[in-house]
């Protein structure tokens, strides 16, 4: 099992689940400030802005890796549009990440011309960045959903998604020599 790819799959799946649940909410709930903020991640986060950023981050990196110079504005952040955007960009981002890891190119660099001035990043660094910053945003989004009475996503913990369901430890017999 490639743990990084399983973590990426969990991320893409959970973002989709979060977006699906935002479709149940009105604009007030989507645009209400999220009280728990993490300095340096997002300014004045709302459920809408956080989910838009979760999808937009994937779009930005795909454009950068493919040599683009401009990231389109993500102003259409309705749940339906976010779902469509994720369905398009999720598989593309996954393909880039899987290809880089499979081919041993995690340390290979690419030029991100969407930055001013252009910057150089590694594929592995890009994936680590996405998984780390997205974990914070997913947690904020799940908290905002819970505030609105939608609590079926738990904490968004990847443990079971990545490693399967654990066994009841009370039934384990140990042999002592």
Where are these regions (language model features)?
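Helix-adjacent hinge/juxtasegments
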Residues: 63-104
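Secondary-structure boundary motif
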Residues: 24-27, 95-102, 147
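Acidic catalytic patch
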Residues: 99-115
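Short, contiguous alpha-helical
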Residues: 5-24, 30-73, 115-177
């Amino acid at each position: 099992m490639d743990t990084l790819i399983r973590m990426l799959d969990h991320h893409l799946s959970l973002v989709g689940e979060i977006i699906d649940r935002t479709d149940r909410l009105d604009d007030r709930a989507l645009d209400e400030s999220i009280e728990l903020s993490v300095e340096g991640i997002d300014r004045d986060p709302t459920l809408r802005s956080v989910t838009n950023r979760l999808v937009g981050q994937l779009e930005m990196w795909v454009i950068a890796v493919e040599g683009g110079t401009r990231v389109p504005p993500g102003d259409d952040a309705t749940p339906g549009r976010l779902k469509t955007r994720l369905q398009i960009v999720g598989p593309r981002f996954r393909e880039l990440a899987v290809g880089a890891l499979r081919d041993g190119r995690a340390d290979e660099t690419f030029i991100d011309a969407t930055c001013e001035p252009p910057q150089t990043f590694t594929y592995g660094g890009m994936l680590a960045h996405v998984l780390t910053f997205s974990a914070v945003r997913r947690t904020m989004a799940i908290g905002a959903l819970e505030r609105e009475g939608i609590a079926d996503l738990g904490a968004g913990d990847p443990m079971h998604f990545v490693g399967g369901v654990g066994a009841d430890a009370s039934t384990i017999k140990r042999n002592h020599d």
